[in-house]
Amino acid sequence: MKFLVVGAGEMGRWFGGAIAAHAAETDAGDETDVAFADTDTEVARAAADAVGGRAVSLSTDERFDAVCIAVPMSAAESAIERHAPTAQRALVDVTGRMADPVAAMREAAPHRERVSLHPLFAASNAPGNVAVVIDESGPVTDRISEALAAAGNRLVETTPGEHDSAMETVQAGTHAAVLAFAAAAEDVPDGLTTPIFEDLSAVAEQVTGNSPSVYAEIQATFDGADRVAEAAACIADADDEEFERLYREASDAIRDASATTEKENR
């Protein structure tokens, strides 16, 4: 089976690597071909070398069983439209947003298998939860799901609307809160820290150790940061009574969210 990954960045390599690794562990190893195409040919070659695949031109007229779109969110729809004809059986994206890419894949490849995937982690933290929207299933997308599950990932089926709404809190709001904490923090003498401060500092270090362009795309795509800013302003301006009310609201919200997560994980 032939796979083309359009975009040889972090998530493209993650996807191609999972497909190649699963093929190597099964009888399909000799029959699986993973190719990468990227605007930077050196990046495509490096990704191909890392998984035992090959690099091809973005303008290739070769056909593949499955094409995975792994480009920035802002380029997803145009990439789907351009490369859909290359996919003979299945079209997949790992761009991070779901509503618009799913609609674009449905329009560009109405008679092919279609799945939208969103790994909810950086590739260096894999495996983890992978959000999945199955728009049209079949043997190729089933094999992709098997490969991701075999790599230790937990596949979480969702809908485009549910996913994109959740990302307002999970990504845009969370990143805004962490970056605001980091930006506002001042130097603290050794020994004058608390466990909460140290934990938040560790999270901030993790967030700020990645590509700022990725986080900028998330902020441009999803709402959520504005609600964090509004909540912070309310807390800063609150008197004692109002602060206690806000504190209780926050406590109840976190407790409810934790209970929901625990129930879903059972």
Residue ranges of predicted features:
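NAD(P)+-binding Rossmann beta1-loop-alpha1 motif at the extreme N-terminus of oxidoreductases
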Residues: 1-53, 62
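Structural motif
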Residues: 2, 65-66, 90
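Short acidic-hydrophobic, aromatic-tinged amphipathic segments that line or gate anion-handling sites
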Residues: 54-59, 156-160
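Rossmann-like NAD(P)-binding element
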Residues: 58-85
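Redox-cofactor binding/interface segments in oxidoreductases and associated redox assembly factors
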Residues: 67-69, 92-93, 132
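Short, conserved loop/helix-junction motifs that constitute active-site signature segments
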Residues: 83-88, 108-109
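Rossmann-fold dinucleotide-binding core
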Residues: 97-154
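An accessory alpha-helical subdomain
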Residues: 154-266
